[in-house]
Swiss-Prot record:
This is Prohibitin-6, mitochondrial. Keywords: Membrane, Mitochondrion, Mitochondrion inner membrane, Signal-anchor, Transmembrane, Transmembrane helix. Residues 1-12 are mitochondrial matrix. Component of a prohibitin multimeric complex in mitochondrial membranes. It comes from the Eukaryota. It comes from Arabidopsis thaliana. The keyword Cell membrane does not apply. Its main location: mitochondrion. Disulfide bonds: none annotated. Pfam families: Band_7 (PF01145).
Length: 286
């Protein structure tokens, strides 16, 4: 059999396969030559030939060379970082201090941050510099001063931390002390001091109240003496005053008896006060 004259027919799916291959390559190129940088982020590019490029790419869509380049995206928004550290104060009291810092990478220094620290720069840098700073600052204050001068302590910690973090191209937006915990002995001493202060305030209040009561008693006695003097003068000058007092007393007795549950029988003429014998026509003494 002569195979030279045999013709192999072309497959009907050859064009479809070529189209699929071209489409796949196009899709691969489109997805691997474009990348997006979201809001609050920045990107740097690693090139297989030159390494990390010095350019920092802002938010938006950017081009890159497939396989030769890949983007490294950083979140440049401030994030909180919490640390707790136990340090000794100047008076040798052990203090557990909690610190909260807001940090972010310096956007224009991202290539250097990646070269020296990588992507997990926070875990590499912040624990060490925060612990060291806390120990240095707490050692300058007594335990009581850490409470009374808390704002000054926080300001000193922020000043030192800002300088230390800047050496690693990290910016600190805020530093705050979240908690102070002292040893049992110091805590007991503080509570005892507070109780003593409260007792002193209570004793002071009692003394002041006694003085006030004393002054009130003196004023009341003076008022009663003056009242007795005026009553005596009124009786001496006009007997009608005594008659008025008897009538008022009779009225009070009548009201009391009327409200009483017991049955009492009195003369309606004088209520046992000898009102009938009163001389109501009293002339003032001359």
């Amino acid at each position: 059999m002569n195979f030279k004259n045999v013709k192999v027919p072309k497959g009907p799916g050859g064009g479809v396969i070529a189209a699929v291959v071209i489409g796949g390559l196009s899709l691969y190129g489109a997805t691997h030559t474009l990348y997006n940088v979201d809001g609050g982020h920045r990107a740097i590019v690693f090139n297989r030939l030159v390494g990390i490029k010095d350019k920092v790419y802002p938010e938006g869509t950017h081009l890159m060379i497939p396989w030769f380049e890949r983007p490294i995206i950083y979140d440049v928004r401030a994030k909180p970082y919490l640390v707790e550290s136990t340090s000794g104060s100047r008076d040798l009291q052990m203090v557990k201090i909690g610190l909260r810092v807001l940090t972010r990478p310096m956007a224009d220094q991202l290539p250097e941050v990646y070269r020296s620290l990588g992507e997990n720069y926070r875990e590499r840098v912040l624990p060490s510099i925060i612990h060291e700073t806390l120990k240095a600052v707490v050692a300058q204050y007594n335990a009581s001063q850490l409470i009374t001068q808390r704002e000054s302590v926080s300001r000193e910690i922020r000043k030192i931390l800002t300088l230390r973090a800047a050496n690693f191209h990290i910016a600190l937006d805020d530093v705050s002390i979240t908690g102070l915990t002292f040893g049992k002995e110091f805590t007991a001493a503080i509570e005892g001091k507070q109780v003593a202060a409260q007792e002193a305030e209570r004793a002071k209040f009692i003394v002041e109240k006694a003085e006030q009561d004393k002054r009130s008693a003196v004023i009341r006695a003076e008022g009663e003496a003056k009242s007795a003097q005026l009553i005596g003068q009124a009786i001496a000058n006009n007997q009608a005053f005594l008659t008025l007092r008897k009538i008022e007393a009779a009225r009070e007795i009548a009201q009391t008896i009327s409200r009483s549950a017991n049955k009492v029988y009195l003369s309606s003429n004088d209520l046992l006060l000898n009102l009938q014998a009163m001389d109501l026509d009293v002339k003032p003494k001359k």
